[in-house]
């Protein structure tokens, strides 16, 4: 079997799919994207395509190593996202050829179901509460919320009180009927993260995510030492080599590699194994589309340390398309009691509505995250 073509489709709301075709008619789908840099990742995919045409798609490990190591410069969000989507599609092809789901090819199940959680947007407490109520009606009881808005390097007590008040109102509205993590998005400095974490402890969040940027990872063990709340991070780390450093340093209780950013299934399964050796949990980052989610689920179901899975159903970014709009077998993604079950169809287990993909790719938006500025005019972290 040989690879004959690779096609990319930029899609609403902020996704990109790729299709790998073979000379035997077997097709694989992947999802390579950096939100806000889809065109750049697309260019990287087509650079890699030049080598991949004519290659055997069954040699996933060798193709991964060529894509990563054959160039003198490597790593980073763009290249690793391009590799990720290609890797997903190669696993999809292998599963279809062997008539088995990917998790079966990776050694079989270690669990029967995985807890799902949903991201809830909104800047005001009432908006967040309404969003949680809506998602509870479709089966969710675990969520992730913004921990704060933009914050100065050293900010005032009013900014701290605003962030704390939002979380307080949510806990008061739902008590212990729900669980939630708080995502700081790396928006705050280490000094302000210390203040916020201390103030938020009383509301017992499930975890604190990206209290500081990955570039400031040396602060993770320092922040972890001051709190009992688990610290999570990893969506902006792109290979096992970056995760190696944070695991050695300690501090993180949960790793959150993104299967569409960190080298795909092949790389993230290795990251999961590294995390298990350090007694660190796995919770793959996934505010993206159905192919990325399927890839995450296959890794979850073969990784003992996987604890829950993010998904984007109903997320506020989804303007123009919802999570399953491009999927024919929607029923396979149904949750039971807030849990996903294993996907059982061959490959990734996602049947893509290709006609719809082609149609909506014709006028896909070029999504960009907003530009935020502080009161003094300096650029703020989004």
From Swiss-Prot:
EC number(s) given by UniProt: 4.2.1.6
GO BP, sorted A to Z: amino acid catabolic process; D-galactonate catabolic process
Functional pathway: Carbohydrate acid metabolism; D-galactonate degradation; D-glyceraldehyde 3-phosphate and pyruvate from D-galactonate: step 1/3
InterPro entries given in the database record: DgoD-like (IPR034593), Enolase-like_C_sf (IPR036849), Enolase-like_N (IPR029017), Enolase_C-like (IPR029065), Galactonate_deHydtase (IPR023592), Mandel_Rmase/mucon_lact_enz_CS (IPR018110), Mandelate_racemase_C (IPR013342), Mandelate_racemase_N_dom (IPR013341)
Disulphide-bridged cysteine pairs: none
Keyword set, alphabetical order: Lyase, Magnesium, Metal-binding
Entry annotated with the keyword Cytoplasm: no
Enzyme class: lyase
Site (Increases basicity of active site His) residue list: 258
Catalytic activity entry: D-galactonate = 2-dehydro-3-deoxy-D-galactonate + H2O
GO MF terms, alphabetically ordered: galactonate dehydratase activity; magnesium ion binding
KW Transcription (keyword) present: no
UniProt cofactor(s): Mg(2+)
Organism domain of life: Bacteria
Location of the active site: 185, 285
HAMAP family, per database record: Galacton_dehydrat
Other observations noted: Reaction proceeds via an anti dehydration.
Family annotation (NCBIfam families): PRK14017.1 (NF010624)
Stated role: Catalyzes the dehydration of D-galactonate to 2-keto-3-deoxy-D-galactonate.
PANTHER family reported in the protein's UniProt record: D-GALACTONATE DEHYDRATASE (PTHR48080:SF2), D-GALACTONATE DEHYDRATASE-RELATED (PTHR48080)
Protein name according to UniProt: D-galactonate dehydratase
Organism: Enterobacter sp. (strain 638)
Gene responsible for this protein: dgoD
């Amino acid at each position: 079997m040989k690879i004959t073509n690779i096609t990319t489709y930029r899609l609403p709301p902020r996704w990109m799919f790729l299709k790998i075709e073979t000379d035997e008619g077997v097709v694989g789908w992947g999802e390579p994207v950096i939100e806000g840099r889809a065109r750049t990742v697309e260019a990287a995919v087509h650079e890699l395509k030049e080598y991949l045409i004519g290659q055997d798609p069954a040699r996933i490990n060798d193709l991964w190593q060529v894509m990563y190591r054959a160039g003198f410069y490597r790593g980073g969000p763009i290249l690793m996202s391009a590799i990720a989507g290609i890797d997903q599609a190669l696993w999809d092809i292998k599963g279809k050829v062997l008539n088995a789901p990917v998790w079966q090819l990776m050694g079989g199940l270690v669990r029967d179901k995985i807890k799902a959680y949903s991201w809830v947007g909104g800047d005001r407490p009432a908006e967040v509460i309404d969003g949680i109520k809506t998602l509870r009606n479709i089966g969710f009881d675990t969520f992730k919320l913004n921990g704060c808005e933009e914050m100065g390097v050293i900010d005032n007590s009013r900014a701290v009180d605003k962030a704390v008040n939002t979380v307080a109102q949510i806990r008061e509205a739902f008590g212990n009927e729900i669980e939630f993590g708080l995502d700081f998005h790396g928006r705050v400095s280490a000094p302000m993260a210390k203040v916020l974490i201390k103030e938020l402890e009383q509301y017992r969040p499930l975890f604190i995510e990206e209290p500081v940027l990955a570039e400031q990872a040396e602060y993770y063990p320092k922040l972890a030492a001051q709190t009992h709340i688990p610290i999570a991070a990893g969506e902006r780390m792109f290979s096992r080599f970056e995760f190696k450093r944070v695991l050695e340093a300690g501090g993180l209780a949960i790793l959150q590699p993104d299967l569409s950013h960190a080298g795909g299934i092949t790389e993230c399964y290795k990251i999961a194994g590294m995390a298990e050796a350090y007694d660190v949990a796995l919770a793959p980052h996934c505010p993206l589309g159905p192919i990325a989610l399927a890839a995450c689920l296959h890794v979850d179901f073969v990784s003992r340390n996987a604890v829950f899975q993010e998904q984007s159903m109903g997320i506020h970014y989804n303007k123009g398309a919802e999570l399953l709009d491009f999927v024919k077998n929607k029923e396979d993604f149904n949750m039971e009691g807030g849990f996903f079950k294993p996907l059982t169809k061959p490959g990734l287990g996602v049947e893509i509505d290709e006609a719809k993909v082609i149609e909506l790719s014709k006028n896909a938006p070029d999504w960009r995250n907003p530009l935020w500025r502080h009161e003094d005019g300096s650029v703020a972290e989004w």
